[in-house]
Design a protein with these regions (language model features):
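Intrinsically disordered, low-complexity proline/glycine-rich segments
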Residues: 1-151
Length: 151
């Protein structure tokens, strides 16, 4: 069972900012003095992955053309909208790792626990995948070792 993830303190694989932020995390579930991190509803994951695949295909098709930067900006905008709509009250991570000309952008935990919920959302854990608007997926690389969350 992986350690529980928390907003504002636990690490991500991408270096900028390197922690799960802005969150905000659960207002009433505190793990190791920090708010618990929550993923998106598992029912919303498939649609979000389909939108991400379409955005990635559009960006890849534009690579090496004068329209590459515009394709990235367009993909970032459409994915940010899709992520925000799918997220609802789930926690959002803002990745500033550059994917020139724009950063990876907003992302959400798409592999949260299927058996443990926090505020009716899947509990976030170390090793979970964060799908971001641009670029490759991110992962939660550190959680609270004293709280383990299953499935």
């Amino acid at each position: 069972m992986p350690p529980a993830a928390r907003a504002q303190v636990d690490l991500t694989a991408h270096p900028l900012p390197g922690i799960l932020t802005p969150g905000p995390g659960s207002a009433n579930v505190i793990i190791g003095f920090f708010p618990a991190w929550r993923g998106i509803s598992l029912a919303a994951v498939a649609a979000l992955q389909t939108a991400k695949a379409a955005a990635d295909t559009a960006v890849a098709a534009a690579q090496g053309t004068p329209g590459f930067a515009a394709a990235q900006v367009s993909a970032a905008a459409s994915m940010s909208t899709a992520i925000s709509a799918a997220a609802g009250l789930a926690d959002k991570h803002m990745c500033a790792t550059p994917f020139p000309p724009t950063p990876h952008g907003v992302g959400v935990d798409i592999t949260g626990s299927a058996t443990v919920q926090i505020n009716f959302l899947p509990a976030g854990r170390q090793g979970d995948t964060i799908l971001e608007a641009l670029g490759p997926p991110n992962t939660i690389s550190k959680g609270e070792l004293t709280v383990l969350i299953g499935g």
